Amino acid sequence: MDGYLHYAINIQKRNNKNKMLKIKTYLEKSKLIPEAGIGLFADEDIKEGQIIWSKDEELDITFTEENFQLLDESQKEFFKKYCYKENGEYIFCIDNGRFLNHSEEINNTLEIYQKSIAKRNIPKGEEIICNYKEMGTTKEDEECNISF
């Protein structure tokens, strides 16, 4: 597991032009959802309709249910905190997109499970919030994502 994660991080470093987050961001304690811990914040003004994030198969780590069950409990807890489910598989974003927190009141929306679009202008310094129910392709995925 550690070797695979190290490999994925090295791919991200080599492929910065293909990074999933398409905007400048920084991490800070969540102001909107303090119990969530760390949140993802805009480090630039974002215009309505601007792409915030796009999926990159090379930079995401995908676990089948069978592979996920092979992890020890501490690994499962880590990945449950930072993964989302799509088509019954666990997807782990290796960039800071994994720090997007959940709320019903969001400032961006997921489009066809491939990219996230700003729903409105987002000023620099605002926390970027998404609805975990939009992540996934099935009702089971949605329920799992919301329970994480």
Please name every model-derived segment.
Residues 2-148:
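Conserved catalytic SET/PR domain of SAM-dependent protein methyltransferases, capturing the structural core
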